[in-house]
Amino acid sequence: MILASVLRSGPGGGLPLRPLLGPALALRARSTSATDTHHVEMARERSKTVTSFYNQSAIDAAAEKPSVRLTPTMMLYAGRSQDGSHLLKSARYLQQELPVRIAHRIKGFRCLPFIIGCNPTILHVHELYIRAFQKLTDFPPIKDQADEAQYCQLVRQLLDDHKDVVTLLAEGLRESRKHIEDEKLVRYFLDKTLTSRLGIRMLATHHLALHEDKPDFVGIICTRLSPKKIIEKWVDFARRLCEHKYGNAPRVRINGHVAARFPFIPMPLDYILPELLKNAMRATMESHLDTPYNVPDVVITIANNDVDLIIRISDRGGGIAHKDLDRVMDYHFTTAEASTQDPRISPLFGHLDMHSGAQSGPMHGFGFGLPTSRAYAEYLGGSLQLQSLQGIGTDVYLRLRHIDGREESFRI
């Protein structure tokens, strides 16, 4: 039974409080502790939020509409005007588009199995989406620059409210993992939710960035992106993290088309590269624990052509065991999967996170790094593939389609 059908089964479509809160919270309600009472009240308010919006026709109507995805080229050429009209057009597009995409995700939460959807952490994320829909649809039509400025404030607030969504989803699924019977359904839900979130954040951040006058940028689009420079930035980050954990880190050599420059959106690389680099460095250090100050280099090769950008990350970290190879791109939230020892599957560097904010941080520590990176790459018309030589090392191939290439670009 899915969550939506159970929620609608209460008297008058209401949601019974006791099943929603679960035994643990029901027990706390009997406590005289002020803290426990506060938690129960928060859970009660959460249940009211979900209940009050489940039968709202606006969400159902918006969920039936298709999303209008833009190509980066469309965003690039619509991103400048002398009179500022591009800001109004962009804001009006967001005002129409964001509620539709968020309604699609609310529908996804409704389709989760009831026992998973009632997990307090998952329910909190569900509530965030419902509140975002409410705030966006309550905003009056954007008529002038003053309206647009207020809309920007709302967008910034929502971006901040949702910055920890990936971490929360991972936590919620790990908490309810013993109740997961259909892993394909949950993985489909995660793929759709995470890639939709990426698209929403790219569109929203692009609009906010249109207000900035930054050299070589139109919104979030860099007109002369250097893959070598962005790789170097995340190499420095991953090496610091690795040195903190192991006392040393592999050196990194970059070769190939190191002088390449082209229009591209850095944001997806800012999500994906830290995960791939941390994996390579951890695997290298874990396979050379006897000689931590004499470890092989990680080698990164850049290949640029008129269709796509390819980044190969090669490590000598011992490769991936045959038994793990088929599962390494899966989300790992079940008990059996949590026990694996492969560095690419187990939590990455524990919960040690030197990079806060909404970039790579949310993927850390839950075995979500590779599958999330794979989902992002596919959403952007590319791919993420592994070639492993067990006993030697692993090559990771990241392919991302150009936004101005010979073939049609991806849509956001």
Swiss-Prot record:
GO terms for molecular function: [3-methyl-2-oxobutanoate dehydrogenase (acetyl-transferring)] kinase activity; ATP binding; kinase activity; protein serine kinase activity; protein serine/threonine kinase activity; protein serine/threonine phosphatase activity; pyruvate dehydrogenase (acetyl-transferring) kinase activity. InterPro entries: AK/P_DHK_N_sf, BCDHK/PDK_N, BCKD/PDK, HATPase_C_sf, His_kinase_dom, Sig_transdc_His_kin-like_C. It catalyses: L-seryl-[3-methyl-2-oxobutanoate dehydrogenase] + ATP = O-phospho-L-seryl-[3-methyl-2-oxobutanoate dehydrogenase] + ADP + H(+); L-seryl-[protein] + ATP = O-phospho-L-seryl-[protein] + ADP + H(+). The modification N6-acetyllysine is found at residues 192, 233. Residues 159-404 form the Histidine kinase domain. Allosterically inhibited by certain thiazoles and thiophenes: thiazoles increase interaction with DBT/BCKDH-E2, whereas thiophenes reduce this interaction. Inhibited by 3,6- dichlorobenzo[b]thiophene-2-carboxylic acid (BT2). The ATP binding is mediated by both potassium and magnesium ions. Changing residue 174 to G: In BCKDKD; partial loss of kinase activity. GO terms for biological process: amino acid catabolic process; branched-chain amino acid catabolic process; isoleucine catabolic process; L-leucine catabolic process; lipid biosynthetic process; regulation of acetyl-CoA biosynthetic process from pyruvate; regulation of glucose metabolic process; spermatogenesis. The keyword Acetylation applies. K(+) binds at residues 328, 330, 333, 367. Mg(2+) binds at residue 279. Homodimer. Homotetramer. Dimerizes through interaction of two opposing nucleotide-binding domains. Interacts with E2 component of the branched-chain alpha-ketoacid dehydrogenase (BCKDH) complex. Competes with BCKDK for binding to the E2 component; this interaction is modulated by branched-chain alpha-keto acids. At steady state, BCKDH holoenzyme contains BCKDK and BCKDHA is phosphorylated. In response to high levels of branched-chain alpha-keto acids, the inhibitory BCKDK is replaced by activating PPM1K leading to BCKDHA dephosphorylation and BCAA degradation. Belongs to the PDK/BCKDK protein kinase family. This is Branched-chain alpha-ketoacid dehydrogenase kinase. The lineage of its organism: Eukaryota, Metazoa, Chordata, Craniata, Vertebrata.
